[in-house]
């Protein structure tokens, strides 16, 4: 049994040690943030996006680009009213599309709640279409880490190729980066072979500075993709958010050599908007990102 020597200097050494280790941890994150150029202030980001789109949008608004975008879509159903029958019908539309337009690729994935992964797996006959499942207490992410890990592992076991989880924004807002990143790393481990998409919920983060920080934390925690939004309860994707995320991905790639994908979700209603996002990704990250493995 260890004998504790009580010091009489009046300081709580254990407490001081905790402070020290906390400040070392915080320094570690700031060190990572400092490797990235500061995000442009919000108004300047808007100006940069507008200039980029004015210059390049028209050249990308072509049938070829729209076909490429079609092949990068995650066809999604995430409602409280989802049933096996509805999900099966959705999968049938993907199966039926297969081979009807040789010049248009099928969607990249079908995204559902964990409960329906098995249904998609049974129904899906289309080749090379992946099964994506949300997990981790989607969409608020406010549950126990153990539950998130179990839900992720079960979805993968049922047949999910991709897992979409929301970053814990509560941890983010209180600068609790240690728990935030540890949790994401544990979820990543429970994905095994499946890809991890980390949703930042950019509409809740609001500022470009927050969006950049969240992108950096997600990437260093093992995200294969960073994704804008859940489409639930907060504003969806914006051009400014996509621009900021792309800039962070580019710097991360130059530092580590790792390519992280970007998924735009929530509020993309028109072909024009889809092409605008495509244009932002193309101009910042280049053509090598314009495929379903990274976009």
Label for each model-derived stretch:
Residues 1-21:
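Histidine-centered metal-binding segments
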Residues 20-68:
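Conserved, well-structured core domains of diverse proteins
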Residues 56-70, 81-105, 115-262, 269-295:
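Alpha/beta enzyme core
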Residues 110-112:
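Short, hydrophobic beta-strand segments that form beta-sheet elements in well-ordered domains
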